[in-house]
Amino acid sequence: MSDIKTNKETHTQVSTDADNLTTTPINKTQCAIGQRLYFLPHYLGRAHAVFQNCLFYLAKQFLEPYDGGYWEFYHLSNGGFVMALDDDNTITVNSPNGSSATVDAETASIVVSLMTLSDLSFNLQTDSDELHKVVTSFHALREFALEHTNSNTILKLVD
């Protein structure tokens, strides 16, 4: 699966104060409906099914009021991905670290996705291809989260 068709590109402009440099923004592009079946295996290999089950479980545990829903899939321009709950309502994230915040669905989705990738990385065999894919996906999503409007809240909830 080398060519995944996408649509709906979203841009985030990021600039740093240090030396007045501008960094390249990480863009997200929605996965085409016909490519959804191949989306997670492309990024996570055989770990995709465990990731998805864990994501839904952690969403149920830590997101209020979550009881299932439709998730959009997005490719990130840095090689990563994000799954975002398609919901216009605010969601309260009750983090296992004791923090909580009421945020939009995308922010909540980033938080639970980072938690899931982190949790999954501890449960995969060392030096496996799946572990490498999960860790790479975690770091790519974390880079995207650092550029997000709610980056401080995301970091507070996943720390």
Task: Annotate each predicted stretch with a short phrase.
Residues 2-60:
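Terminal domain-start segments
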Residues 3, 17-19, 67, 72, ...:
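Acidic-enriched, low-complexity/disordered segments with a strong bias for Aspartate over Glutamate
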Residues 36, 67-70, 107-113:
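Short runs of predominantly hydrophobic/aromatic residues within well-ordered alpha helices
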Residues 90-159:
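Polybasic, proline/glycine-rich intrinsically disordered low-complexity segments
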